[in-house]
Amino acid sequence: MNNIFNSPLEMGVRMVYLLLSLYPRKVDLQKLVYLEYAAVYSEDLGGPTSLHTPVPMRGGEHISKRDIIERGLHLMSARSFIDVTYDSTGIYYSAGENGPALVGLIGGTYASQLLMSCEWVARNFGDFGINELLFLFDKKSLTWGAEFSPLEVKGN
């Protein structure tokens, strides 16, 4: 792995932060893709200062993000940073028993801001269903990427 940016490792660590903030909720991949955007570009949704520079057409960076997030979740689940459960309605992710230890080991300004942003996302959008998130982001006229298919999701 030559580049840590936008890698499964970076996405996996970000998912640990997000899932710890959402705990004890269990969420599916599609919801995590939305919530990850909300955590990184929180200012777009009326939240704290965005973690990353809100460049024009930033939705284009999400074209392959869903796959990277999924690989990051797999990477983090192999070490119990993230738990994976499934039932007849789908696959769900939640904070794993080793998640708090990982977050506790990572220091620095970015990590503190990431935690603050993830906690804001959890408070404001953690209980939203997928259709509520679709409506919110459509209403805000955000430029999303190709990973958000026009698939209609029933329920959450």
Task: Describe the predicted segments one by one.
Residues 4-6, 10-11, 45, 59, ...:
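Intrinsically disordered, low-complexity, basic-enriched segments
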Residues 19-23, 39, 76, 106, ...:
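Generic structural signal for hydrophobic core residues of well-folded globular domains
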Residues 84-110, 114-119:
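Accessory beta->alpha helical hairpin/"wing" motif in late/C-terminal subdomains of nucleic-acid enzymes
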Residues 1-60:
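Short, amphipathic alpha-helical interface elements at domain boundaries
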Residues 107-156:
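Exposed, interaction-prone assembly regions rather than primary DNA-binding/catalytic cores
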Residues 69-80:
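Basic amphipathic alpha-helical segments that dock to polyanions
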Residues 42-46, 80-83, 106:
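Amphipathic alpha-helical interaction segments
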